[in-house]
Swiss-Prot record:
Effect on the protein upon substituting R29A: Affects substrate preference. Significantly decreases binding affinity for RNH1
Protein name per UniProt: Angiogenin
Organism for this UniProt entry: Homo sapiens (Human)
Transmembrane spans: none
UniProt entry tagged with the keyword DNA damage: no
Record EC number: 3.1.27.-
Record-listed tRNA binding positions: R45, D46, C105, V127
Length: 147
């Protein structure tokens, strides 16, 4: 009986190593996506906005060349990964059915080291994301969608 429990314990421990990533790991990729690309209610959306948010989000050591922030609510962004607000796009990507208010921050100047200077471009775009387990984990691009 003791030997049977030992084998059972060994099988259980080995099985743990073969299980898929946990929900917590999936959520960490989604959380990283939000940190890099989500700002619900931006203040300004001009060059100063870009310089401030890029610094606050830790995207300036070295200076990131370009980054897009999506504005709005998380529920609408998550819905891109479902049929509610997204359609398949290219390989393993989803494109939003609706456009989002976005701000794109582009590095202006030659040095990749702080202080970073950014130029802001504000507009409305459809966004293309990669999804895992129903959550956006990578912003591929934001595009004007032709009617």
């Amino acid at each position: 009986m003791v030997m049977g429990l030992g084998v059972l314990l060994l099988v259980f421990v080995l099985g743990l190593g073969l299980t898929p990533p946990t929900l917590a790991q999936d959520n960490s990729r989604y959380t990283h996506f939000l940190t890099q690309h989500y700002d619900a209610k931006p203040q300004g959306r001009d060059d100063r906005y870009c310089e401030s948010i890029m610094r606050r989000r830790g995207l300036t050591s070295p200076c990131k060349d370009i980054n897009t922030f999506i504005h709005g609510n998380k529920r609408s962004i998550k819905a891109i990964c479902e049929n509610k607000n997204g359609n398949p796009h290219r390989e393993n990507l989803r494109i939003s059915k609706s456009s989002f208010q976005v701000t794109t921050c582009k590095l202006h100047g030659g040095s990749p080291w702080p202080p970073c200077q950014y130029r802001a471009t504000a507009g409305f775009r459809n966004v293309v994301v990669a999804c895992e387990n129903g959550l956006p984990v990578h912003l591929d691009q934001s595009i004007f969608r032709r009617p």
